[in-house]
């Protein structure tokens, strides 16, 4: 039952993370001595094959203490989906479902990804989860917002990350911020991304990311040509936690 619930939560999280699919390991002892590194870049690798991998380990809080983990991996080769790869995170096999590989995985301090296809290892990398989920502090579900007006989103600080990202979704109207520095605790969504009134419901969410830095926005481009914290293909591998989605009603 727990695994089924966790998988449902994972699939729900995919709806609110259009850009993220979404790691470099950090030395926390150095970070404590010198202060947080708010700039930099994930380790970049030149691809050695024709695959593209978008991989993330997602931390989900089920209320039992600590974070449980899910894996979400999308694989393509020359633009075509790959649905018969062997995807492993540590000792867990991540099964293909829907349009990608999604399943719960055992909780660990470090998540080692290995992907094989047609008898060859095509991708390797490792990821770590942020320490907790961000919490949106200035908005509650049911709040009313004005059409075409800017919206300020504030959230709690999360440790063990390299960047944040803020999203707003309504049907196909999607806003995704650039990658924000780890010392950011607020972001303003421009009013142009709230063009529909009459009580339209917009879902607001904050992603806490371990792996990609504010200088790594190219990781989400369709014409990506390198691998971010993943060796073999182009693409990226990150650890991720997400705030609870806040539903804001937009009126004229």
Predicted regions and their residues:
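Proline-enriched interdomain boundary motifs that mark the N-terminal boundary
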Residues: 133-141
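Bacterial N-terminal signal peptides
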Residues: 9-19
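Short helix-loop boundary/capping segments
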Residues: 140-193
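Edge beta-strands of extracellular beta-sandwich domains
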Residues: 120-130, 214-225
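Bacterial N-terminal signal peptides that target proteins for export
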Residues: 1-10
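Short, ordered, surface-exposed loop/turn motifs in non-cytosolic proteins
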Residues: 69-70, 75-91, 162-164
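Beta-strand-rich modules
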Residues: 195-220
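Bacterial Sec-dependent N-terminal signal peptides
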Residues: 2, 17-57
């Amino acid at each position: 039952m727990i695994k089924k619930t966790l998988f449902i939560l994972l699939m729900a999280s995919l709806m609110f993370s259009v850009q993220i699919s979404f790691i470099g390991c950090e030395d926390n002892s150095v970070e404590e001595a010198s202060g947080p590194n708010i700039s930099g870049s994930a380790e970049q690798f030149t691809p050695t094959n024709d695959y593209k991998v978008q991989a993330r380990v997602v931390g989900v809080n089920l209320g039992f203490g600590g974070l449980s983990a899910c894996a979400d991996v999308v694989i393509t080769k020359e633009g075509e989906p790959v649905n018969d790869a062997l995807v492993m995170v540590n000792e867990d096999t991540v099964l293909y479902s829907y349009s990608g590989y999604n399943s719960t995985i055992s909780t660990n301090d470090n998540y080692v990804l290995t992907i094989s296809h047609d008898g060859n290892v095509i991708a390797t990398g490792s990821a770590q989860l942020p320490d907790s989920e961000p919490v949106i502090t200035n908005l509650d579900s049911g709040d009313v917002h004005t059409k075409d007006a800017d919206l300020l989103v504030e959230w709690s600080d999360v440790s063990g990350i390299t960047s944040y990202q803020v999203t707003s979704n309504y049907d196909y109207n999607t806003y995704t911020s650039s990658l924000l520095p780890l010392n950011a605790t607020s972001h303003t969504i421009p009013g142009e991304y709230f063009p529909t009134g009459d009580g339209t419901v917009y879902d607001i969410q904050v992603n806490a990311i371990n792996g990609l830095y504010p200088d790594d926005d190219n990781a989400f481009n369709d014409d990506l040509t390198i691998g971010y914290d993943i060796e073999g293909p182009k693409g990226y591998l990150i650890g991720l936690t997400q705030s609870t989605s806040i539903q804001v009603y937009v009126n004229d």
